[in-house]
Amino acid sequence: MNKIIFGMVVCALALAGCGHDTFFDEPEETIVHTPPDNDPALEKLETNVGYYYGDKDGDLTRYEFAYRAAGQYCIFPKTEAREQELNRLSQQEDSRVKNMGGFYLVTRSRNFITGDDFVSDRYFINYYRGEPEFVVICPMIIVRVDNSEAKDKILKKYRGKLTQSDRSGQGEMPGGYYLYKFDCHLSTSEQALNLADEIYKRNDVTWAETNKYAPIHFDI
């Protein structure tokens, strides 16, 4: 039976540990928000790109809360309705499920970035509402330029804020343009969005966006 399970891919590291005692260091109700049953995010769950910020089309509106995560996982709110399916997921060989303070952390898909891939010591992620889904902003900016010299100029200008990522899929693309991924050494997703917007306005940049995730759809 096909099921749609609410999930968020959170691309941030705030705490070194992933145990129950270290996942939340603030009262849970101040940093966790469970969308209502009629939330559009529950209707279609998949990775998402194409949102802009500031003066771009499809502006994002800051949602109600910020939170910190102990790694890069899919976070499922624990409810009785989902308990049976999550228990079944936990028995599958390609699934890793951990119950942490009323939440299940599930890594089961190639779309997920594992908890071993840490990105910063403390990075606060705001929860943004796009249409029709919400968006999680990751501390990485992806930039398209016409030549490799533009990459060097960007790194020089934003020294201390950006470094080139060691991820694959960079350099000259088949279409003759260049694509680069920059890790952000910032404190908040708001700063990452603002920096991407600033880079986007450069004459030597075709486009620039933060790496981001919307919910994921599972057929289970």
Can you say where each PLM-predicted feature lies in the sequence?
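Low-complexity intrinsically disordered segments
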Residues: 1-2, 27
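Sec-dependent signal peptide recognition
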Residues: 2-8
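Residue-level signal for mature regions of secreted extracellular proteins and peptides
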Residues: 11-12
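C-terminal motif of bacterial Sec signal peptides marking the signal peptidase cleavage site
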Residues: 15-17
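Sec-dependent signal peptide cleavage junction
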Residues: 19-21
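Primarily auto-inhibitory N-terminal propeptides
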Residues: 25-220
